[in-house]
């Protein structure tokens, strides 16, 4: 859980920026967006397969094999 203790004399904008940075680092926003709507297991499986295929193609292009 993201917790930001505001230092004495610290501006609100600076504290908010630190909070956003912590949330990004912990993946809270990404997780929230992923859980916003129910995803059927078949759709989840297809999404993961697509991502794996995309990573494979990217790796092959980087090696110059594709």
From Swiss-Prot:
In the record, biological process GO terms are: translation
| Keyword line | Ribonucleoprotein, Ribosomal protein
Q: Indicate whether Ribonucleoprotein appears among the record's keywords.
A: yes
**DNA damage is among the record's keywords:** no
Task: Give me the Gene Ontology terms describing cellular component.
Answer: ribonucleoprotein complex; ribosome
Alphabetical list of InterPro entries matching this protein: Ribosomal_bS21, Ribosomal_bS21_CS, Ribosomal_bS21_sf
Q: Which domain of life is it from?
A: Bacteria
Entry's family note = Belongs to the bacterial ribosomal protein bS21 family.
PANTHER family per the record? MITOCHONDRIAL 28S RIBOSOMAL PROTEIN S21, SMALL RIBOSOMAL SUBUNIT PROTEIN BS21
Return the protein name.
Answer: Small ribosomal subunit protein bS21
